């Protein structure tokens, strides 16, 4: 009796329906989804504010990166370096400081949470006392260093408002807190858009102590105009 021909197409079809095949396919799909989420959460570089997702704000995902420029007493530009040292940043991979286009188009503007520094001279408006001191202090403290930013919100100028921390010889420092300690910033006065994380009480306590010690802006005494008052006078005509 001649052998009965085997229909390979039928065998392939029934093989696909095997539970093991389904389990393997489901496992591969789950692994791919999980890997993509890990990549987006920890390893994807955020090049600009356009790459920043609402999820990152909702969950306060920490960002690690390099301070490329300090342009004012309470904000700076930040080049995101996900994975930090473990992914080679600083020893295998370099921040492209010599590329002006990248420094402009692929950095995030960070606004320090909870504080307001004295206003510098803009558009013919006079500078506040200690405005240059605040700028110089922040440059010396952050420029050219790797920092961690915890984002809280995005303001009207498309800046990420968040807590910035930097490692110093005596531990990790909250930059907003250090500015308050040294009297080069005050606690943010605005009612709208104020962000403190869970540090508002601490910030107010540090400001109170700096005021008592007459540090920085508090050395001016009763003549001291806060940044909020300055903006009302010179920008809103009050």
From Swiss-Prot:
Keywords: Calcium, Endonuclease, Hydrolase, Membrane, Metal-binding, Mitochondrion, Nuclease, Transmembrane, Transmembrane helix
GO cellular component, one term: mitochondrion
EC number, as in UniProt: 3.1.-.-
Active site, per annotation: 111, 119, 159
Keyword field contains Ubl conjugation: no
Ranges where the TNase-like domain occurs: 61-220
Chain sites annotated for binding Ca(2+): 116
Membrane topology: Single-pass membrane protein
GO MF term set: endonuclease activity; metal ion binding
Pfam families found in the cross-reference section: SNase
Subcellular location: Mitochondrion; Membrane
Annotated TM spans: 20-39
Principal subcellular localisation of the protein: mitochondrion
PANTHER family: EBNA2 BINDING PROTEIN P100, SERINE_THREONINE-PROTEIN KINASE 31
Protein family per UniProt: Belongs to the LCL3 family.
Protein name from the UniProt record: Probable endonuclease LCL3
Organism of provenance: Lodderomyces elongisporus (strain ATCC 11503 / CBS 2605 / JCM 1781 / NBRC 1676 / NRRL YB-4239) (Yeast)
Gene: LCL3
């Amino acid at each position: 009796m001649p052998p009965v021909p085997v229909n390979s197409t039928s065998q392939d079809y029934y093989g696909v329906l095997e539970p093991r095949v389904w389990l393997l396919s489901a496992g591969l799909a789950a692994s791919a989804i999980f890997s993509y989420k890990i990549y987006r959460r920890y390893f994807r570089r955020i090049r600009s504010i356009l790459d920043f997702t609402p999820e990152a704000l909702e969950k306060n995902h920490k960002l690690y990166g390099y301070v490329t420029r300090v342009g004012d007493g309470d904000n700076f530009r930040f080049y995101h370096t996900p994975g930090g040292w473990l992914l080679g940043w600083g020893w295998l991979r370099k921040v492209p400081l010599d590329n002006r286009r990248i420094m402009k188009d692929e950095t995030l503007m960070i606004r320090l949470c909870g504080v307001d520094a004295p206003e510098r001279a803009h558009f013919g408006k006079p500078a506040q006392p200690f405005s240059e001191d605040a700028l110089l202090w922040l440059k010396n403290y952050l420029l050219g260093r790797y920092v961690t930013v915890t984002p809280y919100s995005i303001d009207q100028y498309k800046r990420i408002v968040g807590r910035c921390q930097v490692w110093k010889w005596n531990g990790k420092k909250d930059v907003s807190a250090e500015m308050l300690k040294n009297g080069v910033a005050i606690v943010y006065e605005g009612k709208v858009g104020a962000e403190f994380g869970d540090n508002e009480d601490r910030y107010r306590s540090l400001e109170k102590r700096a005021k008592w010690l007459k540090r920085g802006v508090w050395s001016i005494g009763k003549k001291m105009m806060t940044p909020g008052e300055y903006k009302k006078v010179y920008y809103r005509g009050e």
